[in-house]
Regions:
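Non-catalytic N-terminal targeting/anchoring module and adjacent flexible stem/linker
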Residues: 1-8, 41, 45, 208
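Class I SAM-dependent methyltransferase Rossmann-like catalytic core
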Residues: 20-46
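A short, structure-level motif marking secondary-structure boundaries and short turns
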Residues: 28-29, 50-51, 57, 166-168
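A structural signal for well-ordered alpha-helical scaffolds and beta->alpha junctions
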Residues: 36, 40, 62, 175-182
Length: 208
C-alpha cells in the first residue's frame, strides 16, 4: 500500500517537469553554434586527467553542466548569484543551485576542482571573484576558467564596441581580459597557470 502510494505521488510530481521537457522539445529551433562544445570538451578532458572527488561549479545558471559532472561520479556543488544576476528568479531543472556570491562567498567547503565556464566575464568584481574561487580550492586543487581573451588589451564590455554583433539589450557586461588581468589574478597566491587553450570564434579582434 505504501509503495503504491509512493509511486502514485512520484507520477504526480513528474507531470510538471515532463510537460516542460516536452514543450521545450517541440519548440526548439536551431539558431547558431556556440562555444560550449569547446569549453565543455576542455572541462571533461581535465576531469579524466584529474579525477577530482569534490567539484564546485560557479555561475551555473540554467545549464546542465553540474549534472553532467555528477554523472561522472564527482560530488558536485553548484552556485550562482541568483539574487543579483537573475532579478526575475532562476530555476535550474537539471541540478540544485545554491544562491551564493563568489565575490563574497559563504561556502566553507574546499574543492579539488572548480569550474567557471563563460561566467567571469560578466562579473565586474572579477578580481574578488577569482580570489574567492582560489580560496575555496584544496591544496593542489585546480581552477578551470573560460572567458573572452585579448592578450594585449582589456575591454570592459565588448557588447559596446562599434560593430558588435551580439549583446544588444543584455543587462550585464561582457569583459575581454588581457595578460595583465591574468597576472593580477595570480598575485599573492600559490597558484600558477598549467594549461591554456586559445580559440577564435569571431573574425574580428574581440569577442563580439
Amino acid at each position: 500500500m505504501v509503495s503504491t502510494l509512493k509511486n502514485y505521488l512520484l507520477k504526480l510530481l513528474h507531470i510538471g517537469p515532463l510537460w516542460v521537457c516536452k514543450l521545450e522539445f517541440k519548440l526548439q529551433k536551431f539558431t547558431r553554434f556556440n562555444e560550449r562544445p569547446i569549453e565543455y570538451g576542455f572541462v571533461f578532458r581535465k576531469l579524466a586527467q584529474i579525477y577530482p572527488c569534490k567539484v564546485l561549479d560557479v555561475g551555473t545558471g540554467t545549464t546542465a553542466l553540474p549534472r553532467l559532472i555528477r554523472n561522472c561520479g564527482c560530488h558536485v556543488t553548484a552556485i550562482d548569484n541568483i539574487k543579483d544576476y537573475w532579478p526575475s528568479g532562476m530555476f535550474n531543472r537539471f541540478y540544485y543551485v545554491m544562491n551564493d556570491d563568489i565575490t563574497n562567498s559563504k561556502i566553507v567547503d574546499k574543492f579539488d576542482l572548480i569550474t567557471c565556464v563563460s561566467v567571469i566575464e560578466h562579473i565586474e568584481q572579477h578580481y574578488a571573484a577569482v580570489r574567492g574561487m582560489i580560496n575555496l580550492l584544496k591544496p593542489g586543487g585546480y581552477l578551470i576558467l573560460t572567458c573572452p581573451y585579448t592578450e594585449q588589451k582589456y575591454v570592459r564590455n565588448v557588447y559596446d564596441l562599434p560593430g558588435s554583433n551580439s549583446g544588444k539589450n543584455i543587462p550585464f557586461i561582457c569583459q575581454s581580459y588581457s595578460r595583465i588581468e591574468l597576472n593580477k589574478w595570480l598575485e599573492g597566491t600559490n597558484c600558477k597557470i598549467v594549461e591554456q587553450e586559445y580559440w577564435q570564434l569571431w573574425d574580428g579582434d574581440y569577442w563580439t
